[in-house]
Structure formats: C-alpha cells, structure tokens
C-alpha cells in the first residue's frame, strides 16, 4: 500500500513559498518560525544580523519550508504563501516559481561551532550519521525495529519513508494515494553484493522502472569521481531542465504516446567510491530525496557490499548557487517528476567500472533505446539532450553521437583573460567546427567524449562493450591475459582514452552498419583547467591515450571489412584512414617541425644576403646585419635549452611540484613564438612588396605555377599558407555563425601553439609509463553498519532494520538541507602524491626513438654533410623544400577538413527539413 504518513494527524513539513529578503530577528510569531525548526537554534536570531540583508546570491524564485504545523494554509496538498510578518517580514516579494535563495537555510557557517566542526571533520561527521540508531540531535537513540525478508534469501532491498517535506512537494496529479505506487513516498535502497554482470533479475535484483512495467527510452548517466556540490548541481539541474523540455513537447508523435514522457526517462548517477565522494554532494542528493543517511550497509551477512543503490522519483532540484527548486503550478517552468537511480560504489574502481554498472547492470534490466553519458560538471544546454535523442530517432543506423562541448568562460567571459582558458576555448571551437564535422561526414568520429556523448544501447551490446570493459581492473582475474593485468604498457595507455576504443569497435562491429555522428544542435559546457599543472596532467592522459588508440584503430582497420557498411561508406573510411595516417606522422615529427620552422624563419629574415644573379639583396631584420644574427642565435639556444629542460622536468618532477618552472616555460615559448609571428609578418610584407603581376609569368600555366611556387618564388607558398591555415579558420567560423573565438582566443593560441609540442607532448611521452589503474579500498566503509541475517518465523532469511518515526526523519532532514544549501567553500587541501614507477624501460625506449627520429630529421634537413649518402642538394635547398612541403601538407589537411565541414553543414541544413518530430 502507498505510504500515508502517521495516523495521528501529524502532517510533517509543509513546503511553502516565503517572500525573499532578510531575517527580522525576533519580530515574528511561532507560526512563522525560521526554516524547519520549532525550537530556537543558536544560528536563528543572529545568523545574518537583525535587519541585515543576506549576502547569499539572490535567485529569482523563492522556496522555504516551515516545520510548524499550520504555517500557511494548504490547498489540495500544495502549500501556499503565509502572511508575511510585520514590517515586511522576510523581505520583499520573491517570484513564486519554486526556488529558494538559500540564505534562510542556516547560520553563519564561518562562526558557528557546529558547522566549523563539520567543515574540518566532515567525513567523521558523515560516518557518525550512518549509524542506524543515530539521533537527529546527536548521540544515540533506541528505536523500534522491523524484520525485512531478503529477496531470494540474499538480496537486501528496503523501502524507506522520505521526509514529509519531500513527500508534500510532489504535485497532487502525480500522487497515487490509493494505489500501490510508492515511488513518491518511499525511497528504495538495495545493497548490491555482486559484480555488475551478476546484477540480474535471476539473482533477485530489480529496478523500479521495470517493476512498474515502464519502457525506458532514454537513460541519462552522470558519472562522478570527487567533484564538489556546485559541479554536480550544475549538471543535475541542467539535466532536469532538459527533461522538462522533452515533457513540454506539444506536437511530439513519440513522447506523448503510451504514457507520460517522464516515465520513459531515467537518470542514473554512478559515484566512484565512498572515499572520494564529497559528503556535501550526498547532502544535496538527500535534499531532493535520492539519498538518506543511516541507510547504507557495508555488508549483508558477511558478504561485502559492492554498490549501494538508491531509487526515488523526485520533483525537487538544487541549482549550482544552492537554491532549492520545487513545483508550484502546472506551468511550463515546473519540473516534472524524474526517475533517479543513484549507484554509490563502495570502492574506487575507476570510470570503466562505473560504465559497467551502467550498461551491464542497469542497462540490461531497463533495456533503454539511447544512453546519454555525462560527466559531473558538464552542463548540457537547453534542449541539448532532446537534440541528441532526435539524432537517433531520425537515423536508424546511428550507433553513437556527440554534441558540441565548449569551455566555461565565466560571467562576461572573464576567464578568457587567462591564456590557458582562451587556448583551450579555441581548441574546442575549432574541433567542433572542422574536426568533428569532417569525421561525421566520413561516418566514423574517432572519439565521442565521455563528458557529453550518446550511444544506442543495442549497438554497443556484444563485442564493443566486451572490448571496452577489458580495461576494467575488477575483471582482471576473470579475463586473465586479456584483462588489464595481462596487457602491455601500450594497451594500458590505450585504455586511458577508452572512449576511442568503444567508437572504433562500434563502427567495426561484424555484420552491422552502425555509424557515428556529430550533432551541432546539442551543446554542453564544461570547466577547463585554469592552471599549468592541471592542464599538463590532463593532456598527459589525453595525448598518450589518443595516440595509442589511434594506432590501435589503424592497425585493426582490416576488421572494417567484416562489417556491413556499403561500398560508398567503405570508400570514405579508406580516405579517412589515409588522413589519419598523415596526422599520426605529422604528430610524431612535430617536435622537429616546430624547431625547423622557427630556425628557418629566423634565417630567412635575419641573415643578410648580398645581391647576386639568383637573389636580391636584403639586410638582417629587425636589428640590422650585425645584431640580428646574434640575437637569433641566442634565441635558438634558449629554445633548445628550454626543450631540454622539459625532458628533465618530465622525467623527474610532477607538474604540481614544478609549477613555476612550467609557467616560466610557457612564458618563454610564447615570447619566442611572438617574435616568430612578427618575422612571419615581415616575410609576408616582403613577399608582396613586388606586385604579384610582376612576379608571375603568365605566358602559360606551367610558367605561372613555376614562378608562383618554384625556384625562388615565395609568394605562392606564403599565399597558400595564409589561405589554408588562417583563412579557412575565419571562413569556417563565420559560416558556422560562431566567429568570436577568432578574435578573443585565436591570438592566445598563436602565441602558445608551440607549447602543445614543446611542453605537453614532451611531458606526455616521458610519462608513458604512468597509468593509474587498480582498485583502492574504502577506509570509511569499515566503520559502516552491517546487515546481519537471521531466520524468520517461516525459516526465511530476514534482516532486522531500525524504523524511525516520521518526526525524527524530518528533524534529520532539517540538518541535511542546511548543509546542502550552505554556501560552497572551496577545499584547498593538497592532493596526496601518487606515483607509478613501473614500465619505465618502455618509456625510455619510446622517448629515445621519438627524440632520435626528430633529431635525425632536423640534422638531415639542416646539415651539408650528407653528400656521401647521395643527397646532392645543399642544406639551404633542402630546408626550402622541407618548408614548402610542410606548408603544402598542412594546407592540404586544412582543405580536407574544410570540405568535410561544408558537407556536414549542408547536409545538416537539408536534413533538418525532413527530420521526424
């Protein structure tokens, strides 16, 4: 039966709107007591100062909750505004749309002893609250107990009443007061003591959406590691508003058929370990009803719990600025019910294992059509999740898709003042404008970022997921040599970019013709590293993982022939193969290419040349014939010295331990690059100082090409470089209707682009051995209560469970909400040192081969001592040819990207006219 609360007339907490403003001290009666409390608290009267306006950010909405029964009258179960206290009471009227500013939810967190202790010893406080007989006011309390039968004698699955405030927040039209549906009145907890592969109906495990016979069309997964409550709230609230966009569709031929749209959507949160979880985040989840303290069990009858699974359907949400939102009316801004599954893993077993819980455990029971993957901190824009789903709905062969990820720039773009943020913003933008559309045109997007991507569930079932989960450390014993422990260092690095492996396996799936696509209308916003150490550490994993995964896809390209793709698609896959091989080669030799480009430009501009029959006279620029060559030589030595320094730092230091040295390196390379840009501008001006018609021989096409690109002609080479490298960036950005990054981020990128090779790639390759795998146990889990099994009256397995009265549940909820809505204070505790000392021999061989091949290329190009090997050209001639080849090859790759972008843009514009709605 549905839960109806107590039978003595206790109605619990009533959610109600209170006008926004500040506290008036004691100028209110008992019926209008602050927040949830009947009794005076030390932080009530003086938490903000009498008649002092709050300092918390003010939302456009208002929601508070009164513990005093009858505080405000109710109508059909929905609380309405009480009469304001005298003199304006709580302040000026807030808009009654369902959000609370948050400042009425607690005290002065900087001075309150209770909250100061909580901030210092947060984890210990959380552990004390997990004891079943913990009283809301502290200490222990004796409670009545109930005996609960285990499912199939081994599975612990219990229903717990939610706080009255959460129950009363549900709109009446969704309540099933007389039926058996308890999803709004009780939270369901399951202690999973099995591997994700064994989380099956056969073994006694189940999930509410399937129990209610609901079809799951969309499974939205949020993976979490150690993000703070602001980052999680940003993602979670954006997801709920996106679900509201879907529910509000009026003319949908799908979502409005066969039941309410919200019943076809499930949000799954997977947290990677108790130790790493920010306990303030759990308070946020408890505030919306998805989690409760004092519920989890570390083991069931001695069998260790692997994952704690909570289920609840909520209409509440917490915004990133700690404002609580609840439904007020049936307007379009009201959040619909959202079905939540919260999986809190007991141990930190990495992201791949979190995805195994998602796909192999929950996915097989719910059998969704589309799974959307988000990282905590990613903020999907309005209607973005709908746009991702529509891509699958309109293309039956679409196996995976991703949207546009862009950097979070702060209010007014203030973060763009940080060069690292601006560089990453430009990188994201160009990837979204040129790279992703090109790969989408081919049908194989090399990486669908795990922070914002989607897959068709039946497309990834089978071999794609099997190969993907080979990187899960918890399967190492089961898989043997195929598992992570049996892999060489190359394969381990490959799984640092595991999403690339899944993409390739999906497209190459035998007998199938799944393809991948980029969906422009879906946009997500994410934080990017703002400091040099964080930036370098992130790119170490990205560069090593993507390089290994790229080689994997090239070496296993033959498996494409076993797929079901048609001949046209296969032709474009071969074109993409050649394009990817070229990119890998250019990436490998990029260290030498940047050095040669730098020295060639310095020599072309700074070396004085006397007039002769083959060349015109020019002087060293910008400091004259004597100073310029000397200045350039000094810069070359500085350049080489800092490159060598990067090897020393990468082999012996962590970025966080050499922060200022790395910052200095970024600064020095940017100064050298700025000097090269000035010299390049001078080269362009000098090349076009003679009118173009005088440089060209237009007698015939052959002579015209020879005068433009051959011999001593430099105008043609420079013209090609300007158009293909820089011109296409501007043209594509304007065609994409998003050109602003070319003005505020492109200049930073021009200054720092050499650091991508000279700092980031050097650090990445020198730390090839650093793969952070393995399972880390949970120290906190040892202090959690156990579920002891005994025999019941009919000899069945039962567990004795504490049964708290509703008053205690509600009183505990008071403190939870205060903690959840407290102002966020950033944790500045330094991270512990984490070093991996294995596989250094492989790293050494990799670095030696990479460094030797790049040095060999540089020496061959710039040295005159190779005549004995049959190389008759002088070093200056070889340098000129290499420089031309480099510019032409780079230009050709840019043209290919631009063609792919044009095809994608045209196809997207045409197909949107025929897409089903």
From Swiss-Prot:
CDD domains noted in UniProt: Chitin_synth_C
Membrane-spanning segments: 571-591, 630-650, 665-685, 717-737, 745-765, 844-864, 885-905
Record localization: Cell membrane
Enzyme superclass (EC): transferase
Biased composition regions of type Basic and acidic residues, renumbered to the chain: 1-11
Signal peptide (from-to): none
EC number, as in UniProt: 2.4.1.16
Region Disordered, residue ranges: 1-56
InterPro entries: Chitin_synth, Chitin_synth_fun, Chitin_synth_N, Nucleotide-diphossugar_trans
Membrane topology listed for this record: Multi-pass membrane protein
Extracellular face residues: 1-570, 651-664, 738-744, 865-884
Glycan-linked positions: 544
Molecular-function GO term, any one: chitin synthase activity
GO biological process: cell wall organization; chitin biosynthetic process
One GO cellular component, as annotated: plasma membrane
Residues in the Cytoplasmic compartment per record: 592-629, 686-716, 766-843, 906-917
The entry's keywords: Cell membrane, Cell wall biogenesis/degradation, Glycoprotein, Glycosyltransferase, Membrane, Transferase, Transmembrane, Transmembrane helix
Recorded superkingdom: Eukaryota
Catalysis performed (reactions): [(1->4)-N-acetyl-beta-D-glucosaminyl](n) + UDP-N-acetyl-alpha-D-glucosamine = [(1->4)-N-acetyl-beta-D-glucosaminyl](n+1) + UDP + H(+)
Described purpose of this protein according to its UniProt entry: Polymerizes chitin, a structural polymer of the cell wall and septum, by transferring the sugar moiety of UDP-GlcNAc to the non-reducing end of the growing chitin polymer.
Family: Belongs to the chitin synthase family. Class III subfamily.
The name this protein goes by in its record: Chitin synthase 1
Source organism of the structure: Neurospora crassa (strain ATCC 24698 / 74-OR23-1A / CBS 708.71 / DSM 1257 / FGSC 987)
Gene of this entry: chs-1
């Amino acid at each position: 039966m549905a839960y109806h609360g107590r039978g003595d007339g206790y109605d619990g907490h009533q959610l109600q709107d209170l006008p926004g403003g500040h506290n008036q001290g004691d100028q209110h009666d008992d019926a209008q007591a602050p927040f949830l409390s009947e009794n005076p608290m030390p932080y009530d009267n003086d938490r903000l100062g009498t008649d002092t306006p709050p300092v918390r950010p003010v939302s456009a909405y208002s929601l508070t909750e009164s513990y005093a029964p009858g505080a405000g009258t109710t109508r059909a179960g929905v609380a309405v505004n009480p009469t304001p206290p005298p003199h304006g009471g709580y302040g000026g009227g807030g808009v009654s749309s369902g959000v609370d500013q948050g400042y009425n939810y607690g005290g002065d967190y900087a001075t309150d002893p209770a909250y100061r202790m909580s901030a210092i010893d947060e984890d210990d406080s959380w552990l004390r609250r997990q004891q079943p007989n913990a009283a809301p006011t502290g200490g222990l309390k004796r409670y009545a107990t109930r005996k609960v039968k285990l499912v199939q004698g081994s599975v612990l699955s219990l229903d717990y009443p939610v706080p009255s405030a959460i129950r009363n927040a549900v709109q009446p039209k969704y309540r099933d007061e007389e039926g058996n549906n308890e999803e709004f009145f009780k939270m369901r907890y399951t202690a999973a003591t099995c591997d994700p592969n064994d989380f099956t109906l056969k073994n006694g495990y189940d999930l509410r959406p399937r129990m209610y016979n609901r079809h799951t069309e969309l499974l939205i997964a949020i993976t979490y590691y150690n993000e703070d409550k602001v980052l999680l709230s940003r993602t979670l609230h954006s997801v709920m508003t996106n679900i509201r966009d879907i529910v509000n569709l009026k003319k949908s031929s799908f979502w409005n058929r066969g039941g309410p749209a919200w019943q076809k959507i499930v949000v799954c949160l997977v947290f990677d370990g108790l130790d790493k979880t920010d306990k303030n985040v759990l308070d946020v989840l408890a505030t919306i009803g998805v989690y409760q303290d004092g519920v989890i069990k570390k083991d069931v009858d001695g069998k260790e719990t692997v994952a704690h699974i909570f289920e609840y359907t909520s209409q509440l949400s917490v915004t990133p600025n700690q404002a609580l939102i609840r439904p007020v009316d049936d307007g379009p801004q009201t959040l619909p019910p959202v079905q939540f599954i919260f999986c809190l893993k007991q141990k930190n077993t990495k992201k791949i294992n979190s995805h195994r819980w998602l796909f192999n455990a929950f996915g097989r029971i719910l059998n969704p059509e589309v799974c959307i993957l988000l990282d905590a901190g990613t903020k999907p824009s309005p209607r973005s999740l709908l746009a991702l789903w529509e891509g699958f709905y309109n293309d039956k062969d679409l196996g995976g898709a991703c949207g546009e990820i862009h950097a979070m720039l702060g209010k007014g773009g203030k973060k763009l003042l940080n060069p690292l943020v601006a560089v990453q913003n430009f990188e994201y933008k160009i990837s979204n404008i040129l790279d992703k559309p090109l790969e989408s045109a081919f049908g194989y997007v090399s990486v669908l970022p795990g922070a914002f991507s989607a897959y068709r569930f039946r497309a990834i079932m089978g071999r794609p997921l099997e190969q993907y989960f080979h990187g899960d450390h918890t399967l190492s014993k089961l898989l043997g040599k195929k598992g992570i422990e049996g892999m060489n260092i190359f394969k381990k690095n490959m799984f640092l970019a595991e999403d690339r492996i899944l993409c390739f396996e999906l497209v190459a799936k035998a007998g199938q013709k799944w393809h991948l696509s980029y969906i422009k209308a879906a946009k997500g916003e994410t934080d990017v590293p703002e400091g040099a150490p964080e930036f370098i550490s992130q790119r170490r994993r990205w560069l090593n993982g993507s390089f290994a995964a790229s080689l994997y896809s090239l070496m296993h390209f033959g498996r494409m022939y076993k797929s079901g793709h048609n001949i046209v698609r296969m032709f474009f896959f071969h074109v993409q193969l050649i394009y990817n091989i070229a990119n890998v080669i250019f990436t490998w030799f990029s260290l030498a290419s940047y050095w040669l480009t730098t020295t060639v430009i310095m020599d072309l501009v700074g070396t004085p040349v006397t007039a002769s029959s083959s060349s015109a006279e020019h002087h060293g620029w910008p400091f004259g014939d004597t100073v310029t060559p000397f200045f350039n030589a000094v810069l070359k030595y500085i350049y080489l010295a800092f490159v060598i320094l990067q090897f020393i730092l990468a082999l012996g230091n962590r970025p966080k331990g050499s922060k200022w040295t790395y910052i200095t390196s970024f600064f020095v390379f940017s100064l050298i690059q700025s000097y090269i840009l000035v010299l390049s501008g001078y080269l362009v001006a000098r090349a076009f100082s003679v009118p173009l018609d005088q440089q060209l021989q237009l007698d015939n096409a052959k002579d015209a090409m020879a005068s433009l690109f051959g011999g001593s002609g430099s105008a043609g080479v420079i013209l090609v470089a300007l158009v293909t490298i820089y011109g296409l960036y501007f043209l594509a950005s304007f065609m994409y209707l998003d050109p602003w990054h070319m003005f505020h981020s492109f200049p930073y990128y021009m200054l720092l682009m050499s650091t991508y090779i000279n700092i980031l790639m050097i650090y990445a390759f020198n730390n090839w051995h650093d793969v952070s795998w393995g399972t880390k146990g949970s120290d906190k889990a040892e202090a959690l209560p156990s579920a002891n099994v005994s025999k019941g009256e009919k000899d069945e397995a039962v567990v004795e469970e504490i049964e708290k009265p509703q008053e205690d549940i509600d009183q505990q909820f008071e403190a939870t909400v205060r903690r959840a809505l407290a102002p966020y204070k950033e944790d500045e505790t330094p991270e512990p040192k984490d070093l991996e000392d294995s596989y250094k021999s492989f790293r050494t061989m990799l670095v030696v081969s990479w460094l030797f091949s790049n040095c060999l290329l540089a020496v061959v190009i710039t040295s005159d001592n190779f005549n004995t090997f049959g190389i008759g050209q002088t070093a200056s001639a070889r340098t000129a040819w290499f420089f031309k080849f480099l510019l032409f090859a780079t230009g050709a790759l840019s043209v290919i990207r631009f063609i792919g972008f044009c095809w994608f843009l045209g196809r997207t514009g045409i197909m949107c006219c025929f897409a089903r709605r």
